[in-house]
Amino acid sequence: MRTPLLVGVDVHQQQNVMSFLDSQGQAPRGGLTVANNRPGSEAFVAALTQVLASGDFDGIRVAAEATGWYWFHFFQLLSEHPALAAWPVELYPFNPRLTARYKESMGDLDKTDALDAMVAADWLRTRRSLPASFTWDAGYLPLRFLTRYRYHVVHNLAREKAYCLAMLYLKASEYIQADKQPFSNLFGAASRAVLQEFASLDQVAALPFADLVEFIDAKGKRRFPDPTDNARKLCQVAQDSYRLPAALQAPIQLVLALSLQQITALEAQEKRLNTAIAERMAAIPQTLDTIPGFGPVFAAGIIAEIGDLARFDADEAKIAKYAGFHWRRHQSAAFEAEDTYLSRAGNPYLRYYFCEAANAVRMHDLAYAAFYTKKCREVRKHAHKRAIVLTARKLVRLVVRLLTSRQPYQPRRSATA
């Protein structure tokens, strides 16, 4: 039977507080507080090796709450430290929310750094529902930083566009109406030029119609099939929209212009990130991008979060649960709930990239399109979102199979073929 030394760490920006336990829940030494920097971590390693040498331990397990990135350098140093090479080292970053729930199960405890460290060590001792252990991987981790920052940029872009549309309604209330939009893409080049170069709708209405047509055609790089129709719709928007009070025209115009600049900057960042991600993906052997609609960015987002399939025993059910594609069962006595709800307790980045990939794949693959349509028709409320999540769950199975076999995607033949 293994007898590992268990160490719980309460991580802070300035210091780390450690608690030591053995497999019986006894403390082989008192607590330790060190600075959260390289000298402090070296002091911890020295204390750790002393305890290991004086006791009958055959391994090390260290757990710390994953508070920001304050735990990362500490774990990375431990994973490669030569003084610990003689013992198997397992490092576990704990979700602080789950640690708090485990602490509640231990009764009415005080809130101190030392107790928080002890709770982490005790959770290690029970071995119940431990997360995947930390491994330093120079292949997946750099890619993960890129894909997670892209997630951050994309969400900021969506948020900024929503804010911009709110300001646009104030400037031209009819501009954003679906049946009256003068441009199919409100954030396209021609639309941005109209919004930035005309301070008010009155200026649009005052412009000779032929000049307005030429302006739209030029800003659209001569790609509009009928710029006259766009100009006509724009004039109708100018006629039907509310008039913004004169006192608000200048500030709203400035806010709208700055918001459009921010959108342009975020779109440039997303494009640059997509290029960097594709370059890194070229060095990773995989066949996910052979799935129709499944480009290198979606493949990177999924691969970076999953990492080594061995962490999940190449089990698609474990990966699906890790992504949060898990519906809790609700049963009591003879009652069995018909409605089940998505857990949302998994990795939000992995869930996001699976859902985005599923939305793209269902537009290019007949089997996934049929599955998506079937799920949409099952309900009236939130049909699209529900169908995308269920399609993403279906996609997990295919992704795991391709990552395991490294074979290109082959569409499943129909029964009549």
Model-derived segments and spans:
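A detector of single, family-specific signature residues
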Residues: 1-417
